[in-house]
Amino acid sequence: MSELAYPYEAPASQALFDRAAAVTPGGVNSPVRAFRAVGGTPRFMVSGTGPYLTDADGREYVDLVCSWGPMILGHAHPEVIAAVQEAVARGTSFGTPAEGEVALAEAMVERVAPLEEVRLVSSGTEATMSAIRLARGFTRRTKVIKFAGCYHGHVDSLLAAAGSGVATFALPDTPGVTGAQASDTIVLPYNDLDAVHAAFAAHPGEIACVITEASPGNMGVVPPLPGFNQGLKDACAANGALFVSDEVMTGFRTSLAGWFGVEGVVPDLMTFGKVMGGGFPAAAFGGRADVMAHLAPAGPVYQAGTLSGNPVATAAGLAQLRLLDDAAYDTVDAVSAQIQALVTEALTKEGVAHTLQNASNMFSVFFTDRPVVNYEDAKAQESFRFTAFFHSLLANGVYLPPSSFESWFVSTAHDERAVQRIADALPAAARAAAEATA
């Protein structure tokens, strides 16, 4: 397109942002939504249908965020909506056990072999926080190994050198996390097994677990090198620690069994969120039955939540999981591959140095000509080119994550019309990236 599809101004969104800023810190309820990394007015959305979002100014966008991953069937899928409406009519929360939470747990255990038992919670942060507590309680050890650029929610002990919004805002750490909490976290370079072995040697009998994103998407998409996750599993087994695989992003997104289904490495504990909630606040952690047996009320490690296993959230999640068959993943993978090819073609034609990386249907573009294998590589890209690329696409009706440190997502609803709109918008975006200056 030679002209912008929409005026750049977004007055209705700006008015809402001004209202929000008066009552909410930074005007948003999750930092990356504020557009601080790219500038401009955050778009306030009023509806979503299939692969499209509509903002407060009435503009329609092809959505490549998909609510940061959960909307793998697209927005407002009729069968998910029907399940939610039916559940709401029965009541929104009971504070008791309910069949829906059992059915969702059964569906997860059926799909993911390492899940022998699972506990439902309400957010990915709760899931990773609880998994870490359980690992410490089971091993009676305190230290945790994590990797720079991997994000595991805003758990105090796991915010050191984290990805996602922490990477977007270039925060090395965050006030409010005490030195004592941070001292029990060992942060290592991602994809570096030698560093892992050295950490175990330096802290014999002290490390409770190693936690990693199964395939990271919070510093952009940086897949594990061949053998890395298996090496983590082996190192943990040799040293009496637990291997915790964070599948909040990849779970039920990268395959029917998440990243485990792609790679086959068996963790001791796993965490889930996003897709399993069908767009509602739902998450989980689970794994080996002997480890999960230490969780209250069966064991001494306490964890609880008023809205855990919420009947509306479990109805949405169960409906979505039941629709995710092999054909659905074939569709998502094919759409993702098609868009990746279009992005590569457009940037190559304009001579823009870039590296496109994917983990199954998750993908992102780094504005560098070098492979990205860790957080330092991700930070070395020319992010100013992403800013120009982002705003050109936004103005032409394509909504990307407003940060160069995030994964892009697609859905089964991204049809030929949606892909064509992306194709039409990419040449101008590639030119904008080529012409951008720091």
Swiss-Prot record:
Provide the primary localization.
Answer: cytoplasm
Catalysis performed (reactions): (S)-4-amino-5-oxopentanoate = 5-aminolevulinate
What cofactor is this protein dependent on? Answer: pyridoxal 5'-phosphate
Residues with PTM N6-(pyridoxal phosphate)lysine: K274
Tell me the pathway.
Porphyrin-containing compound metabolism; protoporphyrin-IX biosynthesis; 5-aminolevulinate from L-glutamyl-tRNA(Glu): step 2/2
Q: Name one GO molecular function term.
A: transaminase activity
**Coiled coil regions, renumbered to chain:** none
In which compartments does the protein localize? Cytoplasm
Q: What is its EC number?
A: 5.4.3.8
Listed InterPro entries: 4pyrrol_synth_GluAld_NH2Trfase, Aminotrans_3, Aminotrans_3_PPA_site, PyrdxlP-dep_Trfase, PyrdxlP-dep_Trfase_major, PyrdxlP-dep_Trfase_small
**Disulfide cross-links:** none
GO-annotated biological processes: protoporphyrinogen IX biosynthetic process
Could you name the Gene Ontology cellular component terms for this entry? Answer: cytoplasm
The alphabetized UniProt keywords are: Cytoplasm, Isomerase, Porphyrin biosynthesis, Pyridoxal phosphate
Instruction: Give the domain of life.
Output: Bacteria
Quaternary organization: Homodimer.
Which HAMAP family is this protein grouped with? HemL_aminotrans_3
The family classification in the record reads: Belongs to the class-III pyridoxal-phosphate-dependent aminotransferase family. HemL subfamily.
PANTHER family per UniProt? GLUTAMATE-1-SEMIALDEHYDE 2,1-AMINOMUTASE, GLUTAMATE-1-SEMIALDEHYDE 2,1-AMINOMUTASE 1, CHLOROPLASTIC-RELATED
**Protein's UniProt name:** Glutamate-1-semialdehyde 2,1-aminomutase
Q: What species is given as this protein's source?
A: Streptomyces coelicolor (strain ATCC BAA-471 / A3(2) / M145)
